[in-house]
Curated annotation (Swiss-Prot):
Subcellular location(s) of the protein: Cytoplasm
Protein name, UniProt field: Ribosome maturation factor RimM
Gene name of this polypeptide: rimM
Superkingdom of the organism of origin: Bacteria
Function: An accessory protein needed during the final step in the assembly of 30S ribosomal subunit, possibly for assembly of the head region. Essential for efficient processing of 16S rRNA. May be needed both before and after RbfA during the maturation of 16S rRNA. It has affinity for free ribosomal 30S subunits but not for 70S ribosomes.
Any one GO CC term of the record: cytoplasm
A Pfam family reported for this protein in Swiss-Prot or TrEMBL: RimM
Keyword rRNA processing assigned: yes
Membership in a protein family: Belongs to the RimM family.
Domain notes: The PRC barrel domain binds ribosomal protein uS19.
């Protein structure tokens, strides 16, 4: 499976027992959705490798205690601690309305109620406190704050994000 076909679920945080169990930090608001997985993809040497789960249980909120098949010792567990965990995109719960996954809107046109379509979303910058749509308008990159108050509609059918942006926000880039 390719990384582009998957979503990041979390990271193997540490060993849990001498029998090879590990704790996976789940980077999600709903860890209970992932308590009974049969398998996950573990990133190892820049490749996604399937690991099958023998047993798992939630542990202290955001952690999943896991025993993988063929990981039977502390040494086996040491070899995978720190690795990222992925699942296929098909396992993401479907969102409706104006809720969306970041990867879902990449490539969507972005439209302002006043200006009309002004570019395509090329990526999302979530490295700061306020996530931003990175929008390409010809050769010009426009940064648009992802603020619920500005968001009018996610039009999945027409692949558009419709916003009501403050006057001057887009124009200052053009």
């Amino acid at each position: 499976m390719r990384k582009e076909e998957c979503f990041y679920l979390g990271k193997i945080a540490k060993k849990f027992s001498f029998k090879g169990e590990v704790l996976i930090y789940l980077d999600t608001d709903e860890p209970e959705l992932y308590e009974n997985l049969e398998s996950v993809f573990v990133e190892h040497n820049k490749h996604l490798v399937p690991f099958f789960i023998e047993t798992s249980s939630l542990h202290k909120g955001d952690f999943l205690r896991v025993r993988f098949e063929d990981v039977n010792t502390e040494e086996d567990a040491d070899a995978i601690v720190g690795n990222s965990i992925y699942l296929p995109l098909t396992m993401l719960p479907k969102l409706t309305g104006n809720k969306f996954y970041f990867h879902e809107v990449i490539g969507f046109e972005i439209e302002d109620k006043r200006l009309g379509v002004f570019g395509k979303i090329t990526s999302i910058n979530d490295s700061s406190a306020q996530p931003l749509f990175e929008v390409l308008n010809g050769e010009v990159e426009i940064l648009v704050p992802m603020i619920d108050h500005f968001l009018v509609k996610i039009d999945r059918e027409n692949k558009k994000v419709i916003m009501d942006l403050p006057v001057g926000l887009v124009e200052m880039y053009l």
